[in-house]
Amino acid sequence: VWIAEKMGDPIEKAIYIPPEHHFVNDYVENLLSYIENGKENTLVKAGIAHYQFEAVHPFEDGNGRIGRLLIPLVIYYRRKLDLPILYLSGYFDAHRDEYLNALHRVDETGNYEIWLAFFFKSVAEQLRETQKLVENIYSLYDDIRDKFGTGKSPYLLPFVEAIFKVPIF
């Protein structure tokens, strides 16, 4: 397995070659130990854990999705979020070149500063976006409750509340 600019590119065009498969279990165990132990700042730990997971690249497919999912789970695991609701995929996708370059700089230099600066910026931006989304949902809830909450049916308001408590997409 290797990572190239385009799917199907030969290994000669690889931009990253993950460790050989016989090292993967040890590297994943090391990553889990890192997540569970230590006193580092939670965001630093989440950022480094994401990089390390991407570097180990333990699966043939889905590493990016799982690596991005790891971020809110690390923060949640360390009890800094009530729910694992911080999703950076949108930001990483919108800034893909910068994201990949920041990860690659760690590979080249062993220095996490550029990666962590990008990571912190992505967290801050995504938190702002999440806050806006939550505010919009509350506003929508208030509008709908005000519009339909005074209806004649005693079931309408509980129905509206149920939709907002357990949305189905």
Predicted regions and their residues:
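FIC/Doc superfamily catalytic core
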Residues: 1-169
